[in-house]
Amino acid sequence: MKENFNVSKLKNGLTILTYNMPYVNSVAINLIAKVGSRYENPGEEGIAHFLEHMAFKGTKTRTAKQIAEEFDSIGGHFNAYTGHEKTVYYSRVLSENCNKALAIIADIVQNSAFAEEEIAKEYQVILQEIAHAQDNPDDLVYEKFYNSVFKDQPLGKPILGTSKTIETFNRDHFLKFTGKHYNAENFYLSIAGNVDHEEIVKEAERLFSSLTQGEKSNFSPAKYIGGHSFINKDLEQTTLILGFEGTSYINLERLYQTQLLAIIFGGGMSSRLFQHIREKLGLAYAVGSYNSPYFDSGVFTIYASTAHDKLELLAAELKNEIKRMAEQVKQEEIERARTQIRSNLQMAQEKVAYKSEEIGKNYAVFGKYISPEEIMEIIMNIKAADIIQTANRIFSSSATSAVIGPNNLSGF
């Protein structure tokens, strides 16, 4: 329902997106900064994530405690996260408190104090976060996996950074990074719920008046490389991650062809991997596949965990299923995958948090709003031949593999 969607651009370049859902009593606010870990220069690894942490640590007019108290006083939820290509500051509040929440978010992205004592304290917190990731087998194997996929590139490096890089950051580093990237051209303010677009535009003009226009940030093109990595670790199970060059955001038709492929291959209980690897052979409890798109690249990932002595058999069976996937797709498989996408899309439309994130992501990635109806039109036009062609394109690329457990994989 595009009639509920509105977009405006402020004089300084800030994009304002709203989706009105008059039947709810709340709003979800997303302030998306189109800058993540892949925008970091050598020596800056981890600064985008560290900067997101500092949002909670005080501004020129609010202490960290005051920020927490103000959000609690309006019964709001506030948090943030950093990805490879974006940083998101988000909140969920009652509609009557939208402007108050927006004022706090505007303050932290424009006026963070970056006090050295707070930086020192947060450094210790992030060190613990890094240590936790190193102790988590799933986090560890995926880190090694991406190191191989995008070797020596920002996309292949951990979002958290390393203890060596983050210990060098001081106030000047944060001011330089925000000065370069935290500008109106890189921000998208998206709000969904019981919201008045014109009121939000008026409030945003006031609250973000000190945000300079700046320039859109750039990054180096990603290049899929691939390779194999092994982590020798004594665990209850061995985990195998396989990857191929997937599909980027560039082409919507290709993107949804790949999504259908991922669902048919390993996206549900009726998927080929689930039925063959788990139900028929009993080789794995968790097995599946998905595509991770980026602006200019993508990674098609297959994952499974198995008993240590079944690793070679698991790899062989996955190889066979990959070959089969590139040869034939049944119409009933396509119909089931289409229904999964349609159901998930329609149910998600009822959630203000999803809708706010959706419209913001649409504009940050595609420069336009893509309605569920448009997505389903694309999905319904995809044929079996398209999925087979997509499977052949993806699975003909160089394989990437990562194993964590006591035994390595002899080859793939």
Curated annotation (Swiss-Prot):
Necessary cofactors: Zn(2+)
Pfam families: Peptidase_M16 (PF00675), Peptidase_M16_C (PF05193)
Co-factor note (free text): Divalent metal cations. Binds Zn(2+).
Keywords from the named record: Hydrolase, Metal-binding, Metalloprotease, Protease, Zinc
Active-site residues, as the UniProt record annotates them: E52
Record field: transmembrane: none
Root EC class: hydrolase
The UniProt record lists the keyword Transferase: no
InterPro entries to which the protein is assigned, alphabetical: Metalloenz_LuxS/M16 (IPR011249), MPP/UQCRC_Complex (IPR050361), Pept_M16_N (IPR011765), Pept_M16_Zn_BS (IPR001431), Peptidase_M16_C (IPR007863)
Enzyme Commission code: 3.4.24.-
PANTHER family: METALLOPROTEASE, MITOCHONDRIAL-PROCESSING PEPTIDASE SUBUNIT ALPHA
Protein name (database record): Uncharacterized zinc protease RBE_0522
